[in-house]
């Protein structure tokens, strides 16, 4: 009996010594920042920094509260971060460099009224997940999905609500006027599916179709600076004024200003109506307008040359 007791005691002592030799991950005892209490959220991938604040239970861009934000992305990110805050640790951090925490550039920070928790992301493991640490539990390591971490490269302009353009049809189109400071002025009148200028028929077969399908594909710059306006080609923009009968039957003028070619090569920079925001419009939505402008400028330059020769 004594011998059996000794064996049991020895086993218990060995288990105790083994346990003492390992660090245990901290237990989760309720998260200090619950999803329902988040009042601010920001993220960065070291190239972009985007900050949001909750105003009257609605998410706003912290650096422009009047920005036309589609908060679908923010709500999804908030949900994913809320789940991540409840994740269990995978163990204690023995060496920060092993996990990439010594130079972590990607992070999400969430705030309630009293506390901010920052989640920093280090390296990816063999399965493609990212090691994560929390500043309120700096000794513990966690794992985060790659899908979430990739979202940290999302620009605020990717979340912009794009403007709804007027619905132009053959029935409501009246006139289209092209103006540019370089001596361009072309006034087109629509009648029975044809276009005329100064009483003469103008070849513009696809103009109506293009006007019916106008759309902007992305927001490029909100409240642009003078430098950005110039860089995007709006020093001497091509102005397109469309007069049409609106939904209540009265006449309205809608103005589209076309700047330079977009850096991605897929469209042109434009502004819509009185809004100074710069958007991008696909090239194939502007083919007829740009061709009419080019042809008219060419005719003007020929006339000018002939006038100079006669003088």
Regions found by a protein language model. Give the residues of each.
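C-terminal motif of bacterial Sec signal peptides marking the signal peptidase cleavage site
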Residues: 16-19
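Positively charged n-region of N-terminal signal peptides that target proteins for export
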Residues: 1-11
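A short-motif feature that recognizes glycine-rich, charge-decorated loops
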Residues: 21-311
């Amino acid at each position: 009996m004594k011998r059996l007791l000794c064996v049991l005691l020895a086993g218990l002592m060995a288990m105790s010594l083994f346990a003492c030799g390992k660090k245990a991950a901290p237990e989760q005892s309720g998260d200090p920042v619950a999803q329902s209490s988040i009042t601010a959220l920001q993220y960065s991938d070291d190239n972009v920094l985007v900050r949001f604040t909750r105003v009257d239970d609605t998410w706003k861009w912290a650096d422009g509260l009047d920005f036309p934000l589609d908060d679908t992305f923010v709500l999804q990110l908030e949900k994913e971060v809320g789940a991540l805050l409840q994740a269990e640790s995978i163990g204690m951090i023995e060496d920060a460099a092993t996990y990439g925490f010594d130079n972590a550039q990607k992070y999400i920070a969430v705030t309630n009224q009293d506390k901010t928790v920052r989640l920093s992301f280090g390296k990816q493991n063999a399965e493609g997940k990212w090691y994560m640490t929390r500043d309120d539990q700096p000794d513990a390591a966690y794992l985060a999905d790659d899908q979430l971490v990739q979202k940290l490269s999302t620009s605020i302009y990717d979340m912009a609500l794009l403007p709804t353009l007027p619905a132009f049809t053959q029935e409501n189109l009246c006139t289209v006027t092209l103006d540019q400071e370089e001596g361009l002025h072309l006034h087109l009148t629509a009648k029975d599916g044809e276009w005329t200028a100064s009483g003469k028929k103008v070849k513009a077969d696809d103009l109506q179709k293009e006007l019916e399908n106008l759309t902007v594909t992305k927001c490029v710059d909100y409240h642009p600076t003078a430098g950005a306006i110039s860089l995007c080609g709006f020093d001497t923009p091509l102005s397109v004024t469309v007069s049409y009968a609106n939904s209540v039957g009265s006449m309205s003028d809608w103005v589209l200003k076309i700047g330079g070619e977009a850096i991605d090569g897929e469209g042109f920079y434009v502004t819509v109506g009185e809004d100074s925001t710069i958007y991008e419009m696909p090239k194939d939505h502007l083919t007829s307008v740009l061709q009419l402008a080019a042809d008219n400028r060419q005719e003007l330059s020929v006339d000018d040359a002939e006038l100079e020769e006669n003088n």
